[in-house]
Amino acid sequence: MHSVRRLASVFADAVRIYYDDGGCPLCGRETSGGHICTGCETALDAARLPENAFVLRRQHESGDIRNAGKEPEPLDCFSFYAYESDAVRKLLFYLKKYPDRRTAKELAARLCEILPDSRKADRTLYVNIPRSAAGMRKYGFDQAALLASTAARLLDRSGTWAKGGTKAAVPAVYFADLLAVRPFGKVQKALTARERAANKSGRLYVRPFFRHLPWVPRHIVITDDVITTGSSVLAAAETLRGYFPNAEISALSLAVVTRFRFDEPLEDLLN
């Protein structure tokens, strides 16, 4: 009964957001078309990162037998905002709670701006970090999947390429909900950086339907709403490399935590 009530609530929220013409998603002020208001936009602009690209790498723990002698591959990442801003936190909270496609389209367009051209076409696959089971039960949707699918749809409108010279068009940019998470893990929010990495290690897997992709991807963009310690995107990249060894993999997020209190400062990981 609780799940039915929750589903009805999510559906009602989606209908309200879709047909509501006014209201900034962050502060509730009336705006034309329900876009982000000028004041909140100014606050978000102040939180925009001066450098959107960085490399994420994590060294293995000493004594880790599973990865002995194996150097972890670095991951190219692209983020738009710094998480520490109050406006960014409000925006992320809103995205976690409401499946607002209008706001997601606006934000996905910004994410597309910071991506290099190689990640925008030519058999590029967008993959989301799967939301936790608790989050899916509570809100009924995956905010990272919404961002990733919207970005892929925006980029694919720029053109398609014809397969074998026939009239049948194949999308150059494609979204697939490929990744799933195994159960019985700990809640990430309460863990340190090392604990997060251990919690995610081996828990992500690729769903069987990946064989039905329109092509073998040349580029894979792992999309999430926020990168905190980087354990999720690194675990996703490691899993995807096992299935697509020749693909160029990178990560894309709306925000990144530039300072976080855990075992190792995040600045040591973002270098």
Per-segment meaning from a language model:
Residues 1-271:
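Glycine-rich phosphate/pyrophosphate-handling loop used in enzymes and phosphotransfer proteins
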